[in-house]
Regions:
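Membrane-helix interface motif
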Residues: 36-50, 108-130, 194-218, 280-298, ...
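Alpha-helical transmembrane segments of polytopic membrane proteins
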Residues: 24-28, 53-70, 95, 109-110, ...
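N-terminal signal-anchor module of multipass membrane proteins
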Residues: 2-75, 103, 107-108, 154
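C-terminal transmembrane-bundle signature of multipass membrane proteins
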Residues: 28, 32, 36-43, 232-253, ...
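Internal, hydrophobic cores of structured domains that mediate oligomerization or house catalytic pockets
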Residues: 110, 114, 118-137, 152-220, ...
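Cytoplasmic membrane-interface regions of multi-pass membrane proteins
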Residues: 2-18, 71-94, 156-183, 205-209, ...
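Transmembrane alpha-helical segments of multi-pass membrane proteins
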Residues: 18-31, 88-108, 177-194, 263-280, ...
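N-terminal, membrane-interfacial amphipathic/helix-forming hydrophobic leader that caps
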Residues: 28, 86-96, 118-130
Length: 467
């Protein structure tokens, strides 16, 4: 393999610029300052542009996320020259690539979805077309169009990285850019569009009265199971898929699926394993809400409403993605000195603790710091917006800026990468000696599940997070 065929994110090695905690502190000060300034300018309801409506702001931050994934993971920074990517100063590179990503985001939202699809295919993508319908105000037209566009990005932000992480870019892995990038992009875009039609399109068909029986399945097919006609049911499990993809890529190191040595079987198992884990996580988060707040009540307007409960499943999942990416990027995916299963277990525990802490801090103080509404289920309360906004900034810092200022970049040769891949394969070999540990792990997992189920009602009765 020639060095120029290695994806840039794989050929680089980021090392701390200073000893001790100073690199982490420097990057946190840098990224959180950018978050605070940009949040005030673009999102904060008390700020300047006030995109937090909430769907307009959510649409932008969600599409920014998928554009970053496309640029770094799928196109490998094409059309920028590899020499410029390697040699440009991190600040210059971060600024240029960020501006390009914002331009692409605006092109996709306002160019393709709003003006092309909205004017020639689906009315609900265009605020201008929606305002021509009787009874729709400018505000709701804008919100509905933003919601429709955002829902596609939700699906794409799961499918696009999953194609790389689980399917390893097959069948175009050996193509050069831009053929490889456009092939994967078109493949994942079309698959995302099919999933959109089967999940989100029916939701858009019920937002205007009378329901659009001829063009959508109304009421949607999931109504009896999910106890709601809202596509928040799909937002729940798809958001969990998005989170689990990055768990698998980062803190889990694709374990235990990396133990499967047959490539085709491994890719198939990993892709659908991500979905299976996500569904389990989705229904567990739903059950947690029932343990804390009681049964969902169809027709309720706030925290007992099934549609909000499903939305909150996705919101809960995203709280755990923040510490997972922090640990992967700035924590060096600590620990690394034990066996892979032990490393994965410790990281998962740390991410669980971190996710709970972020969840509690957000609902306790976000209305002061971010200008959001106090409480859990207010229509203006969308925690996924600030969480994904922060994640976007971290991705820019780590992918575009090579971890500057706390980290510096070194380049690895193809021989070093192959040697590391062989070492990873050796660590990922199945052994019968793992069977006792596997049995203990399953037993411990079952015990932990019942312990959480028993503890949640007690914590709910004795602690109040939001007064």
């Amino acid at each position: 393999m020639a060095d120029h065929d290695i994806p840039y994110l794989e050929e680089r090695k980021l090392t701390k610029r200073w000893q001790g905690p100073w690199p982490i502190l420097a990057n946190m000060a840098f990224t959180l300052s950018i978050f605070a300034v940009t949040w005030w300018i673009f999102q904060d309801p008390r700020g300047i542009m006030r995109f937090y409506t909430p769907y307009v702001g959510y649409n932008y931050c969600r599409w920014w996320l998928i554009i970053l994934i496309w640029m770094a993971y799928i196109f490998d920074f094409w059309p920028f020259k590899r020499n410029w990517i390697r040699n440009a100063h991190p600040l210059q590179k971060g600024l240029v690539l960020s501006l390009v990503s914002v331009g692409l985001m605006m092109l996709m939202i306002h160019g393709f979805f709003e003006n092309v699809l909205g004017n020639f295919a689906f009315t609900y993508f265009s605020p201008r077309q929606l305002q021509k319908l009787p009874g729709l105000t400018e505000f709701y037209s804008t919100e509905y169009a933003a919601q429709a566009c955002m829902m596609f990005a939700v699906i794409a932000s799961w499918i696009s990285p999953a194609w790389i992480v689980a399917l390893e870019g097959r069948p175009w892995q050996n193509e050069a850019q831009p053929v490889k990038g456009f092939s994967i992009w078109l493949g994942t875009f079309c698959l995302s569009l099919v999933i959109y039609f089967m999940t989100m399109h029916n939701h858009m068909g019920i937002l205007y009265y009378p329901w659009q029986y001829f063009t959508a399945i109304t009421p949607p097919y999931w109504e009896s199971f999910a106890q709601t006609v809202s596509a928040n049911f799909h937002v729940a499990w798809i958001m969990c898929c998005t989170v689990v993809v990055w768990f698998m890529e980062g803190i889990w190191e694709r374990y235990p699926f990396c133990l499967i040595k047959r490539p085709g079987l491994r890719r198939f198992a990993l892709f659908f394993g991500i979905i299976a884990i996500s569904l389990a996580l989705c229904f567990f988060f739903w059950y947690m809400q029932e343990l804390v707040w009681g049964d969902a009540i169809r027709g309720h307007r706030r925290d007992a409403a099934p549609d909000w409960r499903w939305l909150h499943v996705g919101e809960t999942a995203i709280f755990f993605l923040v510490p997972a990416l922090f640990l992967q990027f700035y924590g060096g995916n600590w620990p690394n000195k034990f066996s892979t299963p032990v490393n994965v277990l410790i990281r998962t525990v740390l991410v669980a603790i971190g996710g709970i802490a972020v969840y509690c801090l957000y609902y306790k103080y976000a209305h002061f710091a971010l200008g959001t509404q106090k409480g859990f289920s207010h229509p203006q309360q969308f925690p996924m917006i600030p969480m994904i906004w922060l994640i976007d900034i971290w991705l820019i810092n780590w992918w575009f800026m090579d971890g500057w200022p706390g980290w510096k970049r070194e380049l690895r040769t193809s021989e070093e990468i192959v040697a590391e891949e062989h070492a990873f394969a050796d660590r990922s070999a199945w052994s019968p000696a793992m069977i006792p540990g596997l049995a203990v792990g399953i037993l411990a997992g079952v015990m932990l599940y019942f312990a959480i189920v028993a503890a949640l009602p007690w914590f709910s009765a004795h602690f109040t997070l939001v007064q």
